[in-house]
């Protein structure tokens, strides 16, 4: 094969994300080879390339032909299901690869798998990147947020491609070299955990407005549209306003009311919560959002619980607080509660990233992470520019909660926040995300907590000792003996 005919890059795994990313790369002027084990997907991609502008896409039908169709040093992106399929794909291609060639895994992979593969690739003289890709199918086609971590040389080899393919915002393309090892995958995992929190908080805002405020879907669509022109401007708020407007094609009313209330998940939210526990980082908002997905899955149990508790005398309280509600004030209160809760959720995610960065010596740039999330990805929001500036002001910021700008905003919003949570509790509406965020804020801001009593209990039953506030050292007390003596 003549050198001139070789592709600049290759992509294997032509499900929706893979196809769209390949076409995005080709559209930016980079000839690309594509491969899929099910060859009909190759033909489908070639057909789309022809229709979408005669894009420079070369279809390959065997691992050998695929690898050899790419110019050296070769860069191969793989977008297949995480876990064993990635290892199988790497094995199929590495047989034909040469030292200096690079593999980029663009899936949602567990970061330790990426670190293992980096080590295995190095033994073969190959370079390896684990790259988080956010934005869904639309982002993949028109500009995603990209989070590559691993070999810097591998990143440098395709930096020009990634910078053209990524979403573009006013301060640059939404891609940056994240760091060594599995940092790219870890950052994408936490991004997804934050996404869980965002979606949960929005659903709670909807629940309160609908069931306490009695707002219609039409009114909700207008409210979310209005919110999307202010501090809450974001992809998720924008699409939420669209969702409320869609009519049900099979019946009366809006489609949203006909959707079964069971939430699916892929596992990255669970990984985020597990890592938070592993690193002793409090992430209650993200954990609450995960718990809610688990509980939503218990549809039959929930329906039975509603019946049993009603028969036991529990009055139907959901929405009971709606009489005499000032709707305009409620809408404004919920907006403020959503924003304040969101700050806490992002603070938890960023603190988890900071803890992992310290543990692994990744030297993550938190302001830069916020910047590359401003476009292309699911959590893109104007709010992220504020986070970027907070970390520019103080790269060692302990928490977004104590950034002077965010602190001021939270103090201004706390009265509305408390009203919303209190109202929801009175109305029997669960708002675990907002409650967790408020409890996190109230716990974090207190100079003294009742943890002194917990330490005393631990010392009594387990002789775990305690520290004192007035003198140094570790102390143990014979609590039971002294209590009985003094009784």
UniProtKB/Swiss-Prot annotation:
Reaction catalysed by this enzyme: 6-phospho-D-gluconate + NADP(+) = D-ribulose 5-phosphate + CO2 + NADPH
> What is an example of a Pfam family matching this protein?
NAD_binding_2
Q: Which UniProt keywords apply?
A: Acetylation, Chloroplast, Cytoplasm, Gluconate utilization, NADP, Oxidoreductase, Pentose shunt, Plastid
Q: Which residues bind substrate?
A: 108, 134-136, 191-192, 196, 266, 293, 458, 464
**Cellular-component GO terms for this entry:** chloroplast; chloroplast stroma; cytosol; plastid; secretory vesicle
Biological process annotations from GO: D-gluconate metabolic process; pentose-phosphate shunt, oxidative branch
Ubl conjugation is among the record's keywords: no
> What EC class is this?
oxidoreductase
Q: Which domain of life is it from?
A: Eukaryota
List positions binding NADP(+): 13-18, 36-38, 80-82, 108
Location comes to: Plastid, Chloroplast; Cytoplasm, Cytosol
InterPro entries in the record: 6-PGluconate_DH-like_C_sf, 6PGD_dom2, 6PGDH_C, 6PGDH_Gnd/GntZ, 6PGDH_NADP-bd, NAD(P)-bd_dom_sf, Pgluconate_DH
List residues, modification N-acetylmethionine: 1
Q: Which residues form the active site?
A: 188 (proton acceptor), 195 (proton donor)
Q: Which GO molecular-function terms appear in the entry?
A: NADP binding; phosphogluconate 2-dehydrogenase activity; phosphogluconate dehydrogenase (decarboxylating) activity
Annotated family: Belongs to the 6-phosphogluconate dehydrogenase family.
The annotated subunit structure for this chain is: Forms homodimer. Forms heterodimers with PGD2 or PGD3.
What NCBIfam families does the entry give?
Answer: gnd, PRK09287.1
Q: What does this protein do?
A: Catalyzes the oxidative decarboxylation of 6-phosphogluconate to ribulose 5-phosphate and CO(2), with concomitant reduction of NADP to NADPH.
**Could you identify this protein by its name?**
6-phosphogluconate dehydrogenase, decarboxylating 1, chloroplastic
Its source organism is Arabidopsis thaliana (Mouse-ear cress)
Q: Which gene encodes it?
A: PGD1
